[in-house]
Amino acid sequence: MAWTSAAASMAAAQHDLTTAVFSGGGKQTAEQGRFNILLMGGDAGQDRVGLRPDSMTVASVDTKTGRTVLISLPRNLQSAPFPSSSPLHDRFPHGFRCSDGSCMLNAIYTYASEHRDLYPGVRNPGAQATKEAVEGATGLQINYWVLIDLKGFETLVDSVGGVTMDVYRRVPIGGGSTKIHGYVQAGKNRHLNGYEALWFARSRADSSDYDRMVRQKCVMRAMLKQLDPITVLTKFNKIAAASKEVVATDIPPSEIATMMDLALKAKALPVSSAAMVPPLIHPGAPDYGLIRSTVQKIITKSENIDNRTAEPTPATAPDATPKPKPTASPSRSTQTDDLSKVCAA
């Protein structure tokens, strides 16, 4: 009878999860063989009016192989363009800009939430408008969005038993408006609880926004590699309870199985990464043509990995030149074909 009770409990948790988290925005068709999903980390701190996504990353996933490219946009990106189909296009025909410089990419969420009349019938206008701006900036069709409230991220990580990952530099806990009261210590294969993982991902002390974007990608990669079917099944009720509090998305329930299948494929492959940050892109005066061409180049490069034929390469003598050992710099690049190299301690 125990297994019957457990199955019933899991079924009830699954029903609650799909009702609370998956808003059913409608099934989308993959664009050119890819699903493009906007991942947003939201933070409604005490010093803020409304929620603003502090991190915005597009996960572009090949529907056949699961091979994934993570494309990050800085929260302070100015003049984000809206596609002509967006309700905000007529209001901001030259991009999201204002005279005081406060019209950054992460402010679009709040603006649209305060102007819900522009999005009649849309459950989350802020997320929808941000998705549209990211489409305009990257040139990608964004199929779905996922919003994670950073306040509850700690609970979500704890629900799966923590996360094991390399911590490539010591990261302060606290800082800014509060006193630094500890550190996430550097080291290989550190097992972090939810509290430590949250601060590793969000800490701004002694680092830049761009380094924070790197750390957030490293946490994403570690979670992806760790979440196997056994973990999900054995801890489903805890995951479901935590997810209801911290995750919202417009992925319809009918697509959950498809997304899980892609995640399982993706975890077996290296993750490519690109960030639209200096020196390539300057957030105050971004070149959106350059952003779009860069996005296409890294996606094409990722696809070519699987399209190459297995041809023998001529043998070359090993290079005896000593190579400098990389240092744990506070600022790491995420322009890479394999994110694990960037995240390594």
Language model regions located:
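Non-catalytic, solvent-exposed segments at the cell envelope interface
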Residues: 2-345
